[in-house]
Amino acid sequence: MERWEDAAKLRLEMKARGVEKVPASSWVELDGKVHEFHVGDKSHPLSDKIYEKLDELGMEMKIMGYKPTTEVVMFDIEDEEKEHTLVHHSEKIAIAFSLVTTEPGESIRVTKNLRVCSDCHTAIRLISRITNREIIVRDNNRFHCFRDGYCSCNDYW
């Protein structure tokens, strides 16, 4: 519980000093156009299809034994709500968009402005296996190349 209190204090101090947290965003390019997504973003015209694909992937991942890493959510909320938050991370939305707008077998390339969290890293490994796709994610730390359930970083990032 101390971590939540420390995090809350830090956020208050940041706010008092005028320091703003950079919102997470991920983007992909399709047909020469950049599509940018934020956490929980439903502004895209294909949002219904994107979230349908996220739900479908979530069910398939759970069958494979996936359990969301709720510890990475820095809010003092119920685990069920934390799971809901994790599903809507920007890189997952960008990947789902790519899955519904590209041909099977095509590589997916996503750029993210922040570091990929451990839950998303695990989920993307599974998504690469489920979809038989190469998924390349460039976060602010490194390139991750996911293929058949494995990442080029060997889960060290």
List where the protein language model places each region:
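Terminal (and in a subset, N-terminal) low-complexity or junction segments at the ends
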Residues: 1-157
